[in-house]
């Protein structure tokens, strides 16, 4: 089995469905004997360019290990899911299990927001 990194972008109006979508894709992978090494929900982010007149979308990254038939099934699911605006599947040499640079940035932003909220609460 080969290692893959999958990033897919979901329509911002469908953000509440993302956890269910991730669960569905994880189930597809595991039922066919694949493994999931990392799943990261990057949340709503600014797009580099407009897609279907949208400036923001919900990003999800998955690092998996699976065979070609499972990958074909996942790609088919991405193509025929109207909520998925774009998807990218990249073959990797080995499994990536640590946080991605994007996830580190998301965590830094959350830490900044928490730090900014703390002094505001202390003053009130």
UniProtKB/Swiss-Prot annotation:
Q: Gene name, please?
A: rpsF
Q: Which Gene3D superfamilies does the UniProt entry name for this protein? A: 3.30.70.60
Tell whether rRNA-binding is among the UniProt keywords. yes
> What organism is the protein native to?
Burkholderia cenocepacia (strain HI2424)
Organism superkingdom: Bacteria
Recorded hits in HAMAP family, A to Z, give: Ribosomal_bS6 (MF_00360)
Could you tell me the keywords of this UniProt record? Ribonucleoprotein, Ribosomal protein, RNA-binding, rRNA-binding
**Gene Ontology CC annotations of this record:** cytosolic small ribosomal subunit
Region of interest (Disordered), ranges: 96-124
BP-aspect Gene Ontology terms: translation
Locations of Low complexity compositional bias?
Answer: 114-124
Q: Name one GO molecular function term.
A: structural constituent of ribosome
Q: What is this protein called?
A: Small ribosomal subunit protein bS6
Q: Which family does it belong to?
A: Belongs to the bacterial ribosomal protein bS6 family.
Q: Name one Pfam family in it.
A: Ribosomal_S6
Q: What does this protein do?
A: Binds together with bS18 to 16S ribosomal RNA.
């Amino acid at each position: 089995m080969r290692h893959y990194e999958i990033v897919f972008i979901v329509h911002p109006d469908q953000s509440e469905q993302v956890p269910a979508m991730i669960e569905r894709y994880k189930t597809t992978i595991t039922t066919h004997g694949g493994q999931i090494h990392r799943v990261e929900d990057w949340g709503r982010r600014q797009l580099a360019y407009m897609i279907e007149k949208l400036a923001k979308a919900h990003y999800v990254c998955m690092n998996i290990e699976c065979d070609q038939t499972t990958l074909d099934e996942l790609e088919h699911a991405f193509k025929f899911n109207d909520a998925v605006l774009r998807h990218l599947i990249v073959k990797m040499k080995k499994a990536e299990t640590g946080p991605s640079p994007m996830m580190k940035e998301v965590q830094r932003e959350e830490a900044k927001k928490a730090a900014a909220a703390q002094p505001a609460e202390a003053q009130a």
